[in-house]
A protein has these predicted regions:
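N-terminal start and proteolytic maturation junction detector
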Residues: 14-16, 37, 41
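Gly/Pro-rich, tryptophan- and cysteine-flecked surface segments typical
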Residues: 40-277
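Short, Lys/Arg-enriched N-terminal segments with co-localized hydrophobic residues
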Residues: 1-21
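Bacterial N-terminal signal peptides
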Residues: 29-37
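Bacterial N-terminal signal peptides that target proteins for export
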Residues: 20-29
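Enriched - but not universal
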Residues: 11-12, 31, 159, 234
Length: 277
């Protein structure tokens, strides 16, 4: 009798332990399910911006060009598109210029197809200038979350010593009004720096770009009055060997800084990183 009672108690204890274990497992599964959309989209759970590069159905290239620059060099954008899926679908490319004018072109991508444009604005839009381009394959007629694509962007130019390029980060998260920072700018006889933003809203956007040196001293402030749906860039009018920019937009925006070698026009693109205390 005593043996049977002890056996029954051990069985009940084991069942309770298994029940508690299942509850903990279910709590973990539910927590993971909440985080999964952010993980799948390549986003940090505390931000709308991408944490890693992933295939997507909506991508912003924050800076594109087909324009003559400060030193007389012509800057062009090389865009590479790749469809890793088994579907054939269109990607709508929307070019936003400095005035907020928007031009749309549909690019059909076959399954497994790759397209490369050495002068994207000239080849696709038959235009010159500078701005930003949004690529979209889901929020269009006949779109689907299955129509994912991969994109790579570069601004390049040719000088007497050869070809030089600047890799441009592509963005898959939404624009926001949060403060953001671009660290590592430089302005001297060898390098120049620009700050810019794409206003992803239908309202005028006043973006205050505060420039600090490495000791956190405010050196200068550049104010960008960006029209609705427009892109704007301006030079940093100060000399500093190392510094950073704090962007404060009044409307949702994608902001960046770019450091350019004055001799080669080789550049370093620095997308602004959001910071929310």
């Amino acid at each position: 009798m005593r043996y049977s009672k002890t056996k029954r108690m051990l069985t009940e204890l084991r069942n309770k332990r298994e029940e508690i274990g299942m509850r903990k497992m279910m709590m973990w599964v539910l927590a993971f399910a909440v985080l999964l959309p952010s993980i799948a989209a390549g986003r940090d759970i505390g931000s709308g911006r991408n944490a890693i590069e992933v295939a997507s159905t909506s991508v912003v290239v924050p800076s594109v060009a087909n324009v003559t620059g400060l030193t007389g060099s012509v800057f062009r954008s090389r865009i590479s598109l790749f469809n890793p899926t088994a579907f054939t679908y269109p990607i709508r490319a929307t070019f936003h210029d400095i005035a907020g004018n928007m031009s749309n072109v549909n690019i059909t991508m076959a399954a497994g197809q790759m397209r490369v444009y050495d002068n994207f604005l000239g080849d696709v839009f038959s235009t010159t200038g500078a701005g930003s381009v949004r690529f979209e394959s889901r929020q269009i007629a006949g779109g689907s979350p299955n129509f994912q694509f991969v994109i790579n962007a570069e601004v390049w130019t040719v000088v007497s010593s050869g070809r030089y390029g600047t890799s441009v980060a592509t963005l898959i998260g939404g624009a926001s009004t949060s403060e953001s920072y671009s660290a590592g700018i430089r302005v001297d006889s060898d390098f120049r720096s620009n700050v810019g933003c794409f206003n992803d809203s239908a309202s005028s956007n006043t973006v205050v770009a505060d420039v600090f040196d490495a000791s956190n001293n405010l050196v200068t402030t550049v104010t960008l009055a960006v029209p609705p749906n427009a892109w704007l860039q301006a030079a940093v009018p100060a000399t500093l060997s190392a510094g950073y920019v704090r962007f404060r937009p009044s409307q949702p925006a994608y902001c960046f800084a770019v450091v350019v070698d004055n001799t080669t026009n080789d550049g370093h693109f620095i997308p602004a990183t959001e910071f929310t205390p």
